[in-house]
Amino acid sequence: MAKEYSRTQRIGDQMQRELAELIRREVKDPRVGLVTITAVDVSRDLGHAKVFITVMGEETPDAVQQSLKALNSAASFLRLHLGRSMQLRSVPQLHFHFDESVSRGVHLSALIERAVAEDRLHKDADESGTKE
């Protein structure tokens, strides 16, 4: 059976695709680096949309803040273009946020790899100690 999506999820998915293209094509602000839109959460009343981004390359807090500042200042411009490309009566207000899940995932992967390496080291030490 096909998974059912709510209207807000479908609108969020379409907004994610449209915004990625608009940012790549229309936003000329040098503060905006290589931005990837990871998710768009649209409120039930379609009044607001949280746009979650990551910044590839430079993930320093300063670069992230500069990109967020530039995107939030371009939000009305992007909203206008979204209104032209999407068939919506009203386009949600855009609020850009940094998505920390990617960096958290990388950190957790590194912790897991380190734990596995330590386990192997202890296992090898135990095996070499019992053979003698």
From Swiss-Prot:
A single Gene Ontology CC term: cytosol
Keywords (A to Z) from UniProt: Cytoplasm, Ribosome biogenesis
Record-level GO BP terms: maturation of SSU-rRNA
PROSITE patterns in UniProt: RBFA (PS01319)
One Pfam family per UniProt: RBFA
GO molecular function: ribosomal small subunit binding
Compartment(s) of residence: Cytoplasm
TM annotation in the entry: none
Domain of life from the UniProt record: Bacteria
Family statement drawn from the similarity comment of this UniProt entry: Belongs to the RbfA family.
Functional note: One of several proteins that assist in the late maturation steps of the functional core of the 30S ribosomal subunit. Associates with free 30S ribosomal subunits (but not with 30S subunits that are part of 70S ribosomes or polysomes). Required for efficient processing of 16S rRNA. May interact with the 5'-terminal helix region of 16S rRNA.
HAMAP family linked to this entry: RbfA
Complex formation: Monomer. Binds 30S ribosomal subunits, but not 50S ribosomal subunits or 70S ribosomes.
Protein name: Ribosome-binding factor A
Top-level taxonomy: Bacteria, Pseudomonadati, Pseudomonadota, Gammaproteobacteria, Pseudomonadales
